[in-house]
């Protein structure tokens, strides 16, 4: 059905484990167990819960829960039946809705996936630094044409360190703590709970439960919103999806940029002896890793848009259209993982041709046109831009000798300024 299941399954094994059905049910099991313990042991602390949890977690049975689901046609009800009938937790799920458990489970899964993505992004940054750090400068292209030489350090800073939209900034944004509407009742205002329970005591148990869940899943606290409908508008997942969308756009952009450099011969494959680029043309060496990164980034972007739009909507106080979308949350992270992995593979298997870069720069003195124009403007030469335009427009592959001849042969430039222009270097 998807390449996650076969062709790329080893590349997304961590994501498949996080979002697999069994792990999803296990997280919901942990949440229900923590809630049961909180309401039945009001004076117990985290240490006592940790001991209890280590004993009871082994009772989880994916097989038995799925057997119950064959009858209930509802995964949470099946889980609750398992807790009551197989684990002896007779008041399991008391005061909760399925949305309480489901939305928290997805937030925990998304948090774990985000930590994994953060690690992958750290490795990608290292690969980018190695790839671009092999040379000090490159040819800069605007509108597909040679413009000026550019520093590769500046290029790396744009990709990695640019404020808000660089990899480092987005990596930091993936570290935000999960948020949940856990314990807010059937329509979000705890109406039935307030009719039956002491609301203050109930809220205290909710906070204790969330602390226990955080402990069980190594999360440094869970943020809780007390304002909601039954439907969780998934502010945490919506925020993550927005960051992931921006990440996918960056990965797509940089994959395309490297592909374009490959088309100019500036990026070359390190080892091609055992590989084929085409089933018909033996000479071909294709930058498929960057093409794969681009395609998977586009799929990730599309999934992120769906997650953002669906997470923030519901019919009145509750419907289930969000849940069928959330079941595909792992696919968004899967496509992002493939994009990052493909790009990293490409960066390791290709290199910049330093000799060709320097040869191109040395034979492209038309790239000094802007500097010539600015130098003349600085020295008060009238019509400096138009003079430079006449000197360099449509000129290509200009050698140093051609540049010097062009400067010396331009009558509109005063002699003393010509000497300054001849000092300009690429």
Q: Each predicted region: which residue ranges?
A:
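A helix-coil-helix interface module used to build multimeric assemblies
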Residues: 1-189, 194, 201, 205, ...
């Amino acid at each position: 059905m998807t390449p996650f299941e076969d062709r790329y399954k080893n590349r997304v094994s961590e994501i498949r484990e996080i979002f697999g059905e069994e792990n999803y049910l296990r997280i919901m099991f942990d949440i229900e167990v923590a809630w049961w313990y909180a309401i039945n042991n009001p004076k117990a602390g985290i240490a006592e819960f940790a001991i209890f949890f280590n004993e009871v977690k082994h009772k989880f049975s994916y097989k038995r829960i799925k057997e119950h689901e064959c009858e209930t046609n509802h995964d949470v009800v099946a889980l609750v039946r398992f807790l009551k009938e197989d684990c002896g937790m007779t008041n399991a799920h008391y005061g909760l809705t399925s949305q309480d458990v489901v939305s928290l489970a997805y937030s925990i899964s998304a948090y774990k996936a985000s930590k994994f993505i953060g690690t992958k992004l750290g490795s990608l940054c290292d690969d980018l630094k190695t790839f671009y750090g092999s040379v000090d400068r490159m040819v800069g292209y605007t509108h597909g044409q040679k413009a000026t030489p550019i520093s590769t350090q500046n290029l790396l800073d744009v990709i990695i360190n640019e404020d808000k939209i660089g990899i480092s900034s987005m990596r930091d944004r993936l570290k935000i703590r999960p948020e949940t509407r856990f314990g807010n009742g059937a329509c979000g205002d705890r109406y039935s709970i307030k009719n039956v329970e002491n609301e203050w005591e109930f809220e205290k148990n909710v906070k204790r439960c969330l602390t226990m869940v955080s402990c069980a899943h190594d999360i440094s606290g869970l943020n809780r919103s007390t304002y909601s409908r039954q439907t969780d508008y998934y502010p945490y997942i919506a925020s993550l999806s927005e960051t992931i969308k921006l990440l996918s756009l960056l990965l797509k952009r940089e994959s395309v940029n490297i592909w374009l450099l490959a088309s100019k011969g500036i990026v070359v494959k390190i080892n091609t002896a055992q590989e084929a680029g085409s089933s018909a043309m033996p000479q071909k060496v294709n930058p498929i890793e960057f093409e794969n990164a681009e395609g998977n980034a586009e799929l990730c972007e599309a999934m992120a848009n769906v997650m953002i739009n669906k997470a923030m909507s519901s019919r009145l106080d509750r419907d289930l259209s969000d849940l069928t979308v959330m079941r595909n949350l792992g696919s968004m992270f899967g496509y992002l993982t493939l994009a990052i992995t493909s790009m990293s593979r490409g960066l390791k298997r290709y290199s910049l041709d330093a000799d060709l870069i320097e040869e191109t720069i040395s034979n492209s003195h038309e790239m000094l046109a802007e500097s010539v124009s600015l130098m003349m403007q600085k020295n008060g030469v009238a019509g400096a831009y138009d003079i430079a335009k006449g000197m360099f427009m449509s000129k290509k592959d200009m050698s140093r000798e051609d540049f010097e001849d062009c400067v010396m042969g331009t009558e509109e430039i005063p002699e003393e300024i010509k000497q300054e222009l001849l000092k300009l270097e690429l």
